[in-house]
A protein has these predicted regions:
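Membrane-interface helix-loop junctions and terminal tails of multi-pass membrane proteins
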Residues: 1-307
């Protein structure tokens, strides 16, 4: 038998390697989610190729679905700090708090990389858009180009950037909208990953329904806040915009309200999960759909069950 210190070293390596792989998957998955999403926003804002909120929302939804299918079997496909926090609170045996920081870092990394990619690909189109519309990057009004990366309230593409528009919704109001949308999203996710829910569709369809839910939420609330529901999705590309010349228009934003896209989802996610855990799940009893795994395995799923 190897010495104790060698056994401990082997144990550390055996537990560290799966975490490294999970974090790598979170980087890839978040990158895919954000590149699809802000790519659609860039296409709509800069070229008019996507006409209407629903078209952009559908691309976001499919981006989420694809990212989940790609990464769920490795990392659980959180792809969102609000999702990770919520699972750490309510499924801590499967997703302990010690994983939060590595997951959050990975998600932010993927989002930053996606933002850099869009800046690289669409850079000339952004410059042309600003010139055609008389926008000075980093000055008041340049939210109309910065919205490709971060999010603003109300939606600059619909309401403009003047004082009248800014008076429609406050930073606190934006945080409430973000919390509300994220709560609904997590409520749906918790219902879809709970195989004691006899009304579940085939487990392999769960990513599709999650993506569809997000698409619907975006179509409903994007006029208000651009519908983030994901701190990494907003803050990662927003950092890119900050260093690419938008400065204070990106952070802290024209109303100083960039925090709404971080605090809102982190508060709303656990609220949505709590609604499911304490109001819906107790009514399920011990009913387990035919074809599911055992109750012991399903009591605390880490997230999207695809394997």
């Amino acid at each position: 038998m190897p010495p104790k210190d060698i056994r401990l070293s082997m144990l550390k390596r055996s537990t560290l390697l799966p975490l490294i792989r999970a974090c790598a998957a979170e980087v890839v998955g978040t990158y895919l989610l954000v590149i699809f999403g802000i790519g659609a926003v860039a296409s709509a804002v800069l070229t008019g190729a996507q006409s209407g909120l629903w078209q952009v929302a559908v691309v976001w939804g499919f981006g989420i679905t694809i990212a989940i299918y790609v990464t769920a079997a490795v990392s659980g496909a959180h792809l969102n700090p609000a999702v990770s926090l919520t699972f750490a609170i309510f499924r801590h045996r499967e997703f302990p708090y010690t994983r939060l920081l590595p997951y959050w870092t990975s998600q932010l990394t993927g989002a930053v990389l996606a933002g850099l990619t869009v800046l690289w690909l669409y850079g000339p189109f952004i410059t042309r858009f600003e010139a055609e519309n008389g926008l000075v990057r980093g000055a008041s009004g340049s939210q109309r180009s910065a919205m490709v990366f971060g999010e603003y309230f109300p939606n600059p593409g619909l309401f403009g950037t003047g004082p009248d528009a800014q008076s429609l919704i406050s930073p606190f109001g934006a945080a409430i909208v973000e919390a509300f949308g994220t709560a609904i999203m997590l409520l749906v996710i918790f219902a879809l990953v709970d195989r004691r829910n006899a009304s579940l569709p085939n487990k392999y369809l769960s990513p599709f329904f999650i993506g569809f839910t997000v698409a619907v939420l975006i179509s409903l609330f994007s006029p208000l806040t651009q519908a983030g529901w994901n701190p990494a999705r907003d803050f990662g590309p927003r950092l890119v915009a900050y260093f690419a010349g938008w400065g204070s228009i990106a952070i802290p934003g024209p109303s100083g309200g960039f925090w709404a896209y971080i605090v809102g989802p982190l508060v709303g996610g656990p609220i949505g999960a709590a609604v499911y855990e304490f109001l819906v799940r107790p009514g399920l009893g011990d009913r387990i759909p035919v074809g599911s795994q055992s109750a012991d395995d399903e009591d605390n799923p880490p997230t999207i069950p695809l394997s």
